[in-house]
């Protein structure tokens, strides 16, 4: 059985500290970087069960946050849909770079960019086990009870 997912939201109200260098690119700028595109596909292919969802999500991506290691190789990505509110669809960090705060930096920089651009909310859906990461980045879970509809007793 798969782990339950939670929905999260963040209302950016101030700039947050970012612990690692993160590039925040438009999707058009990102696709011009062929090595980074190949690296993202490689990571998505190995870390997620289905590539179909990624392919379905990609046409709506407006921004990509990228972290590069000291050699310049992209080792962390975050994809953003951006109609009015922003939706984070993928946060991907290569196995050898995990545990270094890269995911936190990608999320924090995305929240900062949202704040600077006047975006009202940033939302995402993720596994429940990642709740500490997203809460540390200023996100609040929308608990299932909050979505429940209670009928009045007769």
Question: Where are the model-predicted features located?
Answer:
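Conserved active-site alpha-helix within GNAT-family acetyltransferase domains
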Residues: 1, 127-151
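Short amphipathic alpha-helix that is part of the acyltransferase structural core
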Residues: 2-53, 68
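Short hydrophobic/aromatic beta-strand or adjacent loop that forms the aromatic wall/cage
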Residues: 3-8, 61-62, 144-148
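Short beta-strand-to-coil "C-cap" segments at the C-terminal boundary of structured domains/repeats
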Residues: 10-14, 148-154
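A conserved beta-strand-loop-helix scaffold within acyl/acetyltransferase catalytic domains
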Residues: 51-70, 74-92
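Conserved acetyl-CoA-binding loop-helix of GNAT-fold acetyltransferases
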Residues: 93, 99-112
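Conserved GNAT acetyl-CoA-binding A-motif
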Residues: 114-126
């Amino acid at each position: 059985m798969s782990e339950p997912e939670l929905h999260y939201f963040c209302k950016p109200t101030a700039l947050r500290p970012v612990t690692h260098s993160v590039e925040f690119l438009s999707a058009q700028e990102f696709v011009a970087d062929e090595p980074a595109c190949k690296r993202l596909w490689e990571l998505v292919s190995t870390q997620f069960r289905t590539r179909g969802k990624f392919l379905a999500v990609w046409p709506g991506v407006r921004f990509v946050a990228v972290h590069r290691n000291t050699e310049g190789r992209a080792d962390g990505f975050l994809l953003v849909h951006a109609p009015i509110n922003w939706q984070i669809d993928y946060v991907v960090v290569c196995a050898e770079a995990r545990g270094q705060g890269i995911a936190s930096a990608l999320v924090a920089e995305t929240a900062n960019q949202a704040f600077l651009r006047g975006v009202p909310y940033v939302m995402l859906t993720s596994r429940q086990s990642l709740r500490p990461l997203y809460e540390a980045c200023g996100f609040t879970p929308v608990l299932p009870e909050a979505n429940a509809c209670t009928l009045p007793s007769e």
